[in-house]
Amino acid sequence: RLTKLLRTLRKRCPVARDAEITLEANPDSACDVKALRALRRAGFNRISLGVQSADDGLLRAIGRIHTFAQVQEAVAAVRKAGFKNLSMDLIYGLPGQTMQQWEDTIAAVIALAPEHISCYGLKLEPGTPLYDRRDSERFPDDDAQADMYLYAVTVLAQNGYEQYEISNFAKPGFASRHNLKYWHMEEYAGFGPGAHSDFGGVRYAYVRDLDSYISGRLILSESESDATLTRDYEYVMLSLRTAEGIDRR
């Protein structure tokens, strides 16, 4: 289905020959070398794995079904399939997480040599099981989370990962192109239920309901035109996230 979807997009939309085409996957679903090779032949050239932690106990605590052994297996499969651009997502501030567990996770992920690493502070989203359990869990306090973040910044830099945005680190030449489009406030188009776009001076999002989306009619759940003040404010806020900062001109 993914290969068919990509072929359809290529037919309908102009796609640059050197486009970065990322597939996001859970580690437990990215261990099939044959399937990964088919995806690479179809045009996918970057894999992003939702690793989150190298500690199996923490993974269970946040409801993840993969283990770190499966992460290692997935990395081996991704490399065997020929992918040269691999990203991994990590989360700090997990319930019960210690500094030692975070240090071990950073070390374990560096040992797998991905080209890109994202480190996100835990965000409790309403409607999720972890949000519902928030009062019964013990989370690292703000100071502990700050220490975890600064540790990642320091150690990743020591291992050749350049920080180009608050949460993102990459080997030279491997900064995520689609991430940079957001931070630089460039246009992007989203497809699918709930997808957001910022295109032609208008921002819009499709409805989340699948049946409504596939009805074939253009249904927007929200839309707003550009406002100079809003754009200026967002430029400042987004630029402050990047290593480049604000252009004072």
Q: At which residue positions do the language-model features occur?
A:
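C-terminal scaffold of the Radical SAM
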Residues: R1-R249
